Amino acid sequence: MRRKRGRPIDGWLVIDKPSGMTSTDVVNRVKRLFDARKAGHGGTLDPLATGLLPIAFGAATKTVPYIMDGTKRYEFTLRLGEARDTDDAEGAVIETSDVRPTDDAFRAALPAFRGDIMQVPPIYSAIKVAGERAYDMAREGRAPDLPPRPARVDRFDLVARPDADTAIFAVESGKGVYMRSLARDIARACGTVGHVAALRRLRVGPFSEADAILLDKIVPSDDNAPASPDLLLPVATALADIPALALTHEEADALSHGRAVSLLDLMGRIPDAVDPACGIVRGMDGARVIGLCRLEDGWLRPDRML
């Protein structure tokens, strides 16, 4: 039997991604540094962007969908006067404008971009169109016609105006919201054009900048051994934002072995914030997280167990 390559390590590492690297480049580099068998990231960042890139190792990869569904916090710099084909500073200029909106004009336009909105992704994105990546089509001169997609924006505020050509915005959003599209569209709504000149991700689900380390701080030991797993956060860290449900040892054992538990046995313990018809909880056996469980049809069912 072919032996699997790498060490079976489990946990999360939050990298402060430098500008110029793709998210895949960062994952591959970190995976080599730790000699890890299995790794993946919790949400793509554009190459231009900096900030939080959570990387899951081993069992933590089971919790990636919950990180990707979590709230993200960003700050981006809008450069006014030039539209670019990529909607960021790396693209070619396709349109210019001399209009420079006032702060009041921006603030008047912002409410239309908050809440549940429809958003057209950038043509340079990883979305597939008839089996092809949109960015591959765009690079070949076949700009894809991308339909609007649902997006949720919880916060979108103007936070600084360094000069007439530049505006800085803070955003909190759900999964799959493109900052480049927000920048493009807020400029259009104010009668001008613009693109993202800088972008930083400040938070992903339960992870904040306090959890992040720089990529160049991960170095092999003197004997060239892999980086220490002591740098990793526990697998359960990713689930900190999900309401906890206290279980008996017997209930935890049943769920861990794939068996459902009746909600009638859990009455009075289900957190108020959880929908008993379709909610997700973090199952706790004492201080130990056993995994994620779903409330469904009168039962608590195992969803992703650790």
Curated annotation (Swiss-Prot):
GO biological process: mRNA pseudouridine synthesis; tRNA pseudouridine synthesis
Entry superkingdom: Bacteria
GO molecular function: RNA binding; tRNA pseudouridine(55) synthase activity
Enzyme's top EC category: isomerase
Catalytic residue positions: D46
Alphabetized UniProt keyword annotations: Isomerase, tRNA processing
One Pfam family, short name: TruB_C_2
Similarity-based family: Belongs to the pseudouridine synthase TruB family. Type 1 subfamily.
Designated name of the protein: tRNA pseudouridine synthase B
Biological source species: Gluconacetobacter diazotrophicus (strain ATCC 49037 / DSM 5601 / CCUG 37298 / CIP 103539 / LMG 7603 / PAl5)
